[in-house]
Curated annotation (Swiss-Prot):
Residues 345-388 form a coiled coil. Keywords: Coiled coil, Methyltransferase, Nucleus, Ribosome biogenesis, rRNA processing, S-adenosyl-L-methionine, Transferase. The active site is at K159. InterPro entries: RNA_methyltr_RlmE (IPR050082), RNA_MeTrfase_FtsJ_dom (IPR002877), rRNA-MeTfrase_E (IPR015507), rRNA_MeTfrase_SPB1-like_C (IPR012920), rRNA_MeTfrase_Spb1_DUF3381 (IPR024576), SAM-dependent_MTases_sf (IPR029063), SPB1-like (IPR028589). S-adenosyl-L-methionine binds at G58, W60, D78, D94, D119. Required for proper assembly of pre-ribosomal particles during the biogenesis of the 60S ribosomal subunit. This is AdoMet-dependent rRNA methyltransferase SPB1. Belongs to the class I-like SAM-binding methyltransferase superfamily. RNA methyltransferase RlmE family. SPB1 subfamily. Component of the nucleolar and nucleoplasmic pre-60S ribosomal particle. It comes from Eremothecium gossypii (strain ATCC 10895 / CBS 109.51 / FGSC 9923 / NRRL Y-1056) (Yeast). Its main location: nucleus. It is found in: Nucleus, Nucleolus. One of its GO terms (biological process) is rRNA methylation.
Amino acid sequence: MGRTQKKNSKGRLDRYYYLAKEKGYRARSSFKIIQINEKFGHFLEKSKVVIDLCAAPGSWCQVASNLCPVNSLIIGVDIVPMQPMPNVITFQSDITTEDCRSKLRGYMKTWKADTVLHDGAPNVGLNWVQDAFTQSHLTLQALKLAVENLVVGGTFVTKIFRSKDYNKLMWVFQQLFDKVEATKPPASRNVSAEIFVVCKGFKAPKKLDPRLLDPKEVFEELPDGPQNMQAKVYNPEKKTRKRDGYEEGDYLLYHTVPIMDFVKVEDPIQMLGTTNKFTLDKDDHEWKIVKKLKQTTPEFKACIEDLKVLGKKDFKMLLRWRKAARELLGLDKDEEQPEIETVPLTEEEQIEKELQEMQQKQNLKKKREKRKQNEIKQKEITRMQMQMITPTDLGIEAASIGRDSLFNLKTAEKTGILDDLARGKKRMVFTRDELAEDNEIQIDENAPLSDRDDLADADELESQLDAMYHQFKARRIERDAHFKAKEARGGDDDAWNGFDEVASDEEPEESKKDYVDDDDSDVSDSDSDEAINQLIAKIKGETGDKKLSAKARALFNDSIFDGVEADLPSEEPQAPASSEQGSKKRRLEEVSEESSSDEEEAEEESDSDFEIVRNEKDESDDDYDSEDEAERSQKEKHAREVDIATVEAMTLAHQLALGQRSKHDIVDEGFNRYSFRDRDNLPEWFLEDEKMHSKINKPITKEAAMAIKEKLKALNARPIKKVAEAKARKKMRALNRLEKLKKKAGLINDDSDKSEKDKAEEIAKLMKKVTKKAKLKPKVTLVVAKGKNRGLSGRPKGIKGKYKMVDGVMKNEQRALKRIAKKHRKKSKH
């Protein structure tokens, strides 16, 4: 008896068929769920309860039993019977019936499923439209079972046929799951219309709309919307063909309409889109009247003969003619609107109306202020989260709030908040009562509401412009690397702060500060500036004991340390007056203390009968040497800090070095027409634009440009950090090996049992190990495939190591490649 040949239509006996036979799976579809599981995060390995709907013959249940954790509950159900499987519960039932639901509840008890699988399909082959709808209906029933049994965050995998109901099902899935994705695994045949949808993150809504799982509601056919005839009339060139067939009862493609119907119709555009020709009835009385219009030209009569060839201009001409015809026939008469009598308001009603308007304006103002306060609070919260606790950041942020909310240092000093500001406290916006205590700050409550609204609108417009400018800068930073580097450096500061002078012995630093802060000085012209100076000095740690560092002075300037020094005993021993070991630093401190208390000395001199004369001590040669060393070190430090990086700076340095310019010339150049421009209360975008153009073009020299070029050449010639570090590591390893060699050689020399010859040989071996060269990569031997080597298979005779067979064709190809590369290089240069 001969063997029957198994059918192989659509390539059914493919490699997955044979793989399933080898692995022991019941069907090739098992590889579909394996590939889906690997692609979407191995959800089966995390599932303790799995339900497989339409499970026959059971291949997906086999995969689940292999991949799920031990002692997992796996249930398979199908309308046809299945062979039993180990670790899997199977029963026969229809998933669309109540019997299936009750059996599932009986097996699961109080558990919920982590994953629900569905690979079912109807018996196909009659009508594709009907088969696709039946599959979509079956998928919706499977989703209904999954919604009843899935745990929160569960996974649902189902099969769908590509059809017109696909998008409707996807919309339903997206309402119930967080993430919905369609996929087609490689195990699925390309000729098959099936695709698989993986829904992850079940939302488990408390109340579910029953229409969401009702097939009648989900797959309802919606009527088509009205045709866009306006697009046909105003864009006749763009034609989109839709093969929808004929309208019911109308089987003609050519339509003619009398011209007077076009005049009387309410929707002329609809008629123009569906009509091919307008006919003229010469016996019509109304046409005889309309024919006398000046718009009724021969061109008009030619256009109405074939409407399908007209353009936008021609259609507009027809609509203008229709409007003129309707006016002539009296069809566009405006409906007379009944006159509304206006009753004048009484005095009480007028007052009440004005009060309502004022109340509305007041409510708008309160709403605006509340919104501003919420924005300020939100900014403060963001600032605290970003740890922006420095007073500079707070002041910059508060400057955009407005005059009423802007803090004042003088008010802060009076209310006792200045110390909190120095410590970095966040509260900088004062209340209305605190501002009222200060006589300099007045809040105009009687200002008209309209003026205040205009000011608020102006502020809002300015803030919008600033925001737009910041967005522009952010986009430019992303696009332009040079601008990003410039912003990171902070840009060029045009403000000139004068020359930094080094404090001399005769005029210590503290005495200079006292001189600057004197009442006769012009720096502190107001109480506000004085408070600012005090706050800055307190923050920087300039006040306090000079023996401490700047950070320590800033710490001990805090108000919590006030009065602590009075309680602590003095631990500093007083040095005798005759001691000769006092350093120059000690003498500087004594001189600074004397110079900082000039007023007290003057009072003491007036009260005392003795005249106090300062003791002038001769400084030794060592002091002069130390002064020279200090001055030299300070110059070296200044040279390290100042880097001449531009051609202008190099030109200026050359001129100063050669005596062509002096310090006074540079100071005079600092006073120009751009120096004293008013920059207060100007927006940032305006200042940035002005900074680009409001600057003096300083001259440069050829020598300075060459010097900068040579400097950059030297910088570029230096190796990069990685190369330098690699060389240093290599050198360090060599030194370490040499040190080890020295130790070993010393041990060999100390060994008395060995002869001098043996010692020399061992030391030579050690030296050979240290100085051995790295292994060179073996070269590939090129063998020309001609003569006895032509058509040779295997290794040629007399060739050892790696080899490569070459011929004349390969040589020509290499030449051609070099020629093409050279041509491309020439093109790229142009």
